[in-house]
């Protein structure tokens, strides 16, 4: 009888050499119970690399691999329960799987476990535990956790709030190239939180965030600064244009700002439908699952034994 571990190794070697037949070997190894194969096959189905996307089948393989102790699958299983995509939302079940993966040192799971404690999802709210898990993930270089940790230190409801520490963390995240880090750092300079108010530095941060990822929050804030002449030469035309562009990309603050100006007959609205505000309660602290197994190219995220 073929050993599933050897079959897995053969499959990974084949896939690494660009041989699509390795996918069949990987599936066979998964069906024989190899947890690493189950995880990798789930990731392929989840991402849509090599095959059509099949989230439902991926969920089943994530569960099998999670029960086999694979931290990546434990995280993804928890994420499905947290977001309620393939199954009904169940924060307690999400918390269970995040904790198992987090205790194995998986940064994205540590981050989401911190979110559960921060927002009280599936557990009593506890800022101390949230900060602990954010810190562990941040120390492993997971930038969303660095941002979340800084957000926690900025939170007025947090008894241990620390603006200077938040500023330091935002700066670290931005220096690591995180676009949200530049936006948050810009806000610190703009509002004078954790550092003296400095409109010039704020404008630099917002501009950098735009250059990296076309961040619409940065675009909106830089537009406001042009309108007011804060840190940049006052230019109403450029400012309104930037705010309009941010609104067209769905930025809610930009939409609301333009609606206020239109209500005061300061500007005309070209397409009122574009400024329809969305009903969203998504907390600002929640970010994407950066580096947690997204579609980055098939060979960059498959696990080996």
State the predicted function of each range.
Residues 2-3, 18, 31-34, 47-49, ...:
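Short helix-capping/linker turns of helical repeat alpha-solenoids
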